């Protein structure tokens, strides 16, 4: 009966989402304008609102509300504004109508960050070309699995590369387990992070090994993204902090993937990485399970850089006795990738952690920093760099 009720709920949600999509398509059809339009080194935004008094564009490259672009209205009620193209990158923006923030109905490219929805704008060129659709795309599955660790059915996204054939047992794939940050969920890396496009392009170019990427929900009390309307659950985890309580990855997810997909079933074929909260989780998961993972990526970790954001200085030795005094116990990774944005106040803590690892003779340590703060434009580049290092 419980299973039937869950299926009924899922069908109802699909129906409501389908209806919303039809309404959005109808709205965009009625709008009859092109927005955004990237042309001749400029970007033009348009929005139909004959009765509006004030319309503007709030964009990520302008600091959102700090510097909005005011739009002007023509005789047909179409508001517009043109602005010089920002540097190549994947950006987000919203339309603000009489103080109300909303989506641009002419742009079907929509991203969600927690409970906030934004339109996406890709300015091509340089590394941003990795974020464009590839001519050899892979696939993303939304997979429900049972977590015995948390006694709940949960959802994860699973990326498989172009050419993947579940029935071909002769090809085994390495797996990257990729974790989101605080406020995110299993959808974050595939939308905001452009994981699928990055992997598609790098694999097609021969810069990354064909691999699977598993993107779970790193919030132990959530069944799935809260957009599905499924309530959270009170749980008791094996570990105490928000950073190291994600024990379900090794207990539930790795066994599920290795039972249901043709993957490499040894530590050389496994990697774990994450951003911010997910970076802290990746650190605990990897160093607690050195026999399971040979590669770890820690992007802008609030755990390791905690002293800069009001927390106590991070002491890895406290969590993993012997990490600095007896490093041979943990010095077994092929790649320990550490990265942070240059304007992120976590960078000093990350740099300090990197130096301690080097001083203690840890092998495979790679450090990279990019212009940017605690934001996706940094983490997308981290992911791109990391997947080119692993499974060699």
Language-model features, listed with the residues they occupy:
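Bacterial N-terminal signal peptides that target proteins for export
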Residues: 1-8
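Bacterial N-terminal signal peptides
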Residues: 8-18
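Non-catalytic cap/lid and distal C-terminal segments of serine-dependent acyl enzymes
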Residues: 22-24, 35-68, 72-392
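Short, solvent-exposed loop/edge segments of extracellular or virion-exposed proteins
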Residues: 27-30
């Amino acid at each position: 009966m419980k299973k039937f009720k869950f299926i009924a709920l899922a069908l109802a949600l699909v129906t409501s989402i389908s209806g919303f999509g039809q309404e959005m398509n109808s709205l965009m059809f009625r709008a009859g304008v092109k927005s955004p339009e990237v042309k001749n080194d400029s970007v033009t935004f348009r929005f139909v609102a004959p009765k509006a008094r004030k319309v503007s564009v709030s964009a990520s490259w302008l600091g959102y509300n700090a510097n909005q672009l005011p739009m002007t209205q023509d005789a047909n009620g179409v508001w517009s504004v043109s602005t010089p193209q920002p540097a190549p990158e994947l950006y987000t923006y919203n339309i603000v109508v009489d103080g109300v923030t909303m989506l641009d109905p002419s742009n079907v490219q929509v991203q969600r960050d927690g409970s906030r929805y934004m339109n996406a704008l890709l300015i091509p060129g340089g590394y941003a070309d990795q974020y464009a659709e590839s001519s050899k795309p892979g696939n993303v599955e939304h997979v429900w699995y049972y977590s015995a660790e948390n006694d709940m059915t949960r959802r994860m996204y699973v990326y498989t590369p172009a050419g993947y054939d579940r029935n071909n047992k002769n090809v085994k794939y390495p797996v990257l387990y990729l974790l989101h940050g605080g406020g995110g969920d299993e959808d974050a890396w595939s939308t905001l992070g452009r994981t699928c496009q990055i992997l598609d392009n790098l694999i097609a170019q021969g810069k990354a090994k064909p691999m699977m990427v598993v993107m779970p929900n790193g919030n132990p009390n959530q069944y799935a993204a809260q957009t599905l309307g499924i309530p959270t659950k009170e749980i008791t985890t094996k570990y105490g902090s928000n950073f190291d309580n994600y024990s379900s990855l090794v207990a539930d997810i790795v066994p599920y993937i290795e039972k249901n997909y043709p993957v490499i079933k040894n530590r050389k074929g496994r990697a774990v990485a994450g951003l911010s909260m997910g970076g802290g989780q990746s650190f605990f998961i990897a160093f607690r399970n050195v026999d399971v993972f040979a590669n770890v990526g820690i992007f802008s970790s609030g755990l390791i850089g905690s002293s800069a954001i009001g927390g106590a200085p991070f002491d890895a030795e406290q969590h993993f006795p012997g990490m600095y005094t007896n490093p041979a116990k943990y010095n077994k990774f092929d790649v320990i990738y550490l990265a942070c944005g240059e304007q992120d106040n976590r960078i000093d803590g990350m740099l300090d952690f990197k130096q301690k690892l080097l001083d203690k003779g840890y092998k495979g340590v790679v450090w990279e920093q990019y212009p940017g703060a605690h934001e996706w434009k940094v983490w997308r580049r981290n992911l791109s760099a990391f997947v080119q290092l692993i499974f060699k």
